[in-house]
Amino acid sequence: MVCNSIIESIGNTPLVQLRRLFGRADAEVFAKLELLNPAGSVKDRPARYIVEKGLTEGAIGPHSHVIESSSGNLAIALAMICGLKGLRFTAVVDPKISPTNLKILRCYGAGIEQVTAKDSQGGYLETRIERVRQMLREQRDAIWINQYANPLNWESHYYGEAAEILAQLAQPADVLVLGVSTSGTVHGIARRLRKAWPSMRVVGVDAVGSVLFGQPSQARELPGIGASRVPELLCRDEIDEVIHIDDYTAATACRRLLAREGIFAGGSSGAVVAAIEQVLHATPVSHRPLRILTLFPDRGERYLDTVYDDAWLARIAARRAVPNLAALPTVASLIPAGVSA
């Protein structure tokens, strides 16, 4: 197939069975590799869906200024898509944005609006959103994507990954394990799959320190999972179980995923791997394989200064009081025998 632009290559990502990672003969784990989307993440889908639907229906015009509060994957996806559509795009970011993401956004030609004041939760999300609202008041042509409240967010996953999974997976999944942040991904996929597989259990994976499911706010470093405010889209009663994963556990699971499956994924992927390990630990051995479905949202290259940096992991481990720092899984220790660093 020949695409007319890079935008048309979004989606149709592979579904891969993880045969080496979990060591359970009575479990089949399948991961949809959203990290293979052209701008590097699952956020390519809502970015395309929301912008194209807005252009078609008139909510976005040829001279619109698209704005979003995002320091990461959605901002990058919007920068790529808006650039190709001839639209101006500005990402409202905060001091926690990684140098890599900032460089990527600038390469795509995005405008950068950075806030510096912390909000009442000690983070920056509310401050960023207030800056977006200020820009909307000041600029008549400004359009806010608003991923936390926009139903087009979850619709993009309902018509996107969920439809593809139904075509890719021959047998129903017993358990869906997905990270939660805006909640668009988990709701869009679960709502579509449950129509076909009504007995499927949905496990949401949240970050320790996130307030999504009633925990107190704490410092956390990995983006892409959890939030410091509850999104308007979140329907807690549609999620059967929630597992909280801390930064250290997510990072070490990322390293196991890379070592055993060769999948170089971002921090939230490690969180879902760690959550699946907990699900399997709590599941008795059975003659019928437990079929688990998950999704890896983004690429590991954006986490070279965190998840895959040994000094960063040691700092996180010390904060968590890991007893044996000398036994930390370094990047070098993950390289298979016979392969040079």
Curated annotation (Swiss-Prot):
UniProt keyword Transferase present: yes
Pathway the protein takes part in: Siderophore biosynthesis
SUPFAM superfamilies registered for this protein in UniProt: Tryptophan synthase beta subunit-like PLP-dependent enzymes (SSF53686)
EC number: 2.5.1.140
Protein role: Catalyzes the synthesis of N-((2S)-2-amino-2-carboxyethyl)-L-glutamate (ACEGA) from O-phospho-L-serine and L-glutamate.
GO terms classed as biological process: cysteine biosynthetic process from serine
CDD domains found in the cross-reference section: CBS_like
Necessary cofactors: pyridoxal 5'-phosphate
Similarity comment text for this entry: Belongs to the cysteine synthase/cystathionine beta-synthase family. SbnA subfamily.
Lineage: Bacteria, Pseudomonadati, Pseudomonadota, Betaproteobacteria, Burkholderiales
InterPro entries the UniProt entry points to: Cys_Synth/Cystath_Beta-Synth, P-phosphate_BS, SbnA, TrpB-like_PALP, TrpB-like_PALP_sf
Protein name: N-(2-amino-2-carboxyethyl)-L-glutamate synthase
Quaternary structure and partners: Homodimer.
PROSITE patterns: CYS_SYNTHASE (PS00901)
